[in-house]
Amino acid sequence: MYSQSMVLLAAAFASFVAASPMALHGANSCSTGPVHCCNSVEHHTQPHANSLARGSGLVGLDIETLVGNIGLDCSPIGLSSTDCTAQTVCCDDVTFDGKVAVGCTPVNLSVL
């Protein structure tokens, strides 16, 4: 019984790790694309996330339709650079010329 529980736990952990959008394809890329440096990363449910998006010039963006973390004012990190004075993230989608990144997960480049 104990060994079955351990096998189930290990399988669940492995599927969680495989589904995480962590950096997997080299020092500055994620499974979803390049690592980005975002000046601000907020969860979409934070009260000020909508005002941050509007302050970035994204008046037409409906924050309520987004899920997860939202990165604002993002730029991809170059192949040989790990310089980011803000938050490094892997994101599902980057739109509005880098103004908004959705589905973002923070990453630590020092451990990649």
UniProtKB/Swiss-Prot annotation:
Quaternary structure note: Self-assembles to form functional amyloid fibrils called rodlets. Self-assembly into fibrillar rodlets occurs spontaneously at hydrophobic:hydrophilic interfaces and the rodlets further associate laterally to form amphipathic monolayers.
Keywords: Cell wall, Disulfide bond, Glycoprotein, Secreted, Signal
Stretches that traverse the bilayer: none
One Pfam match: Hydrophobin
InterPro entries tied to this protein: Hydrophobin
Organism: Pleurotus ostreatus (strain PC15) (Oyster mushroom)
Family as reported in the entry's similarity comment: Belongs to the fungal hydrophobin family.
Described function: Aerial growth, conidiation, and dispersal of filamentous fungi in the environment rely upon a capability of their secreting small amphipathic proteins called hydrophobins (HPBs) with low sequence identity. Class I can self-assemble into an outermost layer of rodlet bundles on aerial cell surfaces, conferring cellular hydrophobicity that supports fungal growth, development and dispersal; whereas Class II form highly ordered films at water-air interfaces through intermolecular interactions but contribute nothing to the rodlet structure.
Keyword hit for Signal: yes
Lineage, broadest ranks: Eukaryota, Fungi, Dikarya, Basidiomycota, Agaricomycotina
Glycosylation sites: 108
Localization annotation: Secreted; Secreted, Cell wall
Signal sequence region: 1-19
Main location: secreted
Name of the protein in its database record: Class I hydrophobin 17
GO molecular function: structural constituent of cell wall
Bridged cysteine pairs (disulfide): 30-90, 37-84, 38-74, 91-104
SMART domains, per database record: HYDRO
Record has Glycoprotein as a keyword: yes
A GO-annotated cellular component: extracellular region
